Regions:
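Metal-associated gating/positioning segment near the N- to mid-region
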Residues: 57-119
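Histidine/acidic-residue-rich, glycine-tolerant segments that coordinate divalent metal ions
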Residues: 102-113, 118-190
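Divalent metal-coordination and catalytic microenvironments
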Residues: 10, 25, 31, 56, ...
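N-terminal metal-binding scaffold of metallo-dependent hydrolase/deaminase domains
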Residues: 1-45
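Active-site metal-binding motif and surrounding structural segment of the metallo-beta-lactamase
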Residues: 41-59
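A generic structural signal for alpha->beta connector loops
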Residues: 30, 48, 93, 124-126, ...
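Hydrophobic/aromatic beta-strand patches that form the interior of the parallel beta-sheet core
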Residues: 7, 50-52, 64, 97, ...
């Protein structure tokens, strides 16, 4: 069990609870937030306890990185879910949206199942995978949006590749509209 930690004079931003104020934060022995906001000040801290003065710094909810290229599966020698988690947490990132540019490419439900299990077992952060817009990232045939979305994919993208065929892109956008799913397109003419 850890000691209580006290942080004072921080700019606290928490959109979910409509907080945007200067105040403090108390983290309990269980590692959970006990109190936050402008009511947390030196009056809330036992006289012998030390506190960290965060004047000029911010306390915010965890950051979501919306475009992460992780090496798993296939390129684990570059990065895996464990190393991604450590690097992300050190910068305040608690959730990532991973791109489908892996080996194998995330374009079918069996790979999604593997990825979700692996992320759950190895990552210390939230992993939200995307699937490719097109099979094998080739820009010619759409993936099965409905099946992939049902497996927990939060969006579709070909990562750093772009869809150059306007007819295909139109079909993709119609399908995305019908299924109410997110499409992320890298903007670049080739």
């Amino acid at each position: 069990m850890m000691k209580k930690k006290y942080f004072l004079n921080a700019n606290i931003i928490d959109p979910q609870n409509s907080i945007d104020e200067v105040g403090g934060l108390i983290i309990g022995e269980n590692g959970l937030i006990e109190a936050a906001g402008k009511k947390v000040n030196t009056n809330n801290i036992p006289s012998r306890e030390k506190y960290i003065d965060l004047k000029g710094n911010y306390i915010i909810p965890g950051i979501v990185d919306m475009r992460v290229f992780v090496g798993e599966p296939g390129f684990e020698y570059k990065e895996n879910f464990r190393t991604l988690s450590e690097a992300s947490l050190s910068g305040g990132v608690t959730s990532v949206v991973t791109m489908p540019n892996t080996n194998p490419i995330i374009d079918n439900v069996s790979i999604v199942d593997f990825l979700k299990r692996r992320g759950r077992d190895k990552a210390k952060i939230n992993i939200f995978p995307t699937a490719s817009l097109t099979k094998n990232l080739e820009g010619t045939n759409m993936t099965e949006f409905g099946l992939l979305q049902a497996k927990g994919i939060i969006g579709f993208t070909d990562g750093y590749k772009t869809i150059q065929n306007t007819r295909l892109m139109s079909r993709i956008m119609r399908s995305a509209y019908d299924l109410n799913c997110l499409v992320m397109q890298h903007v670049e003419d080739k």
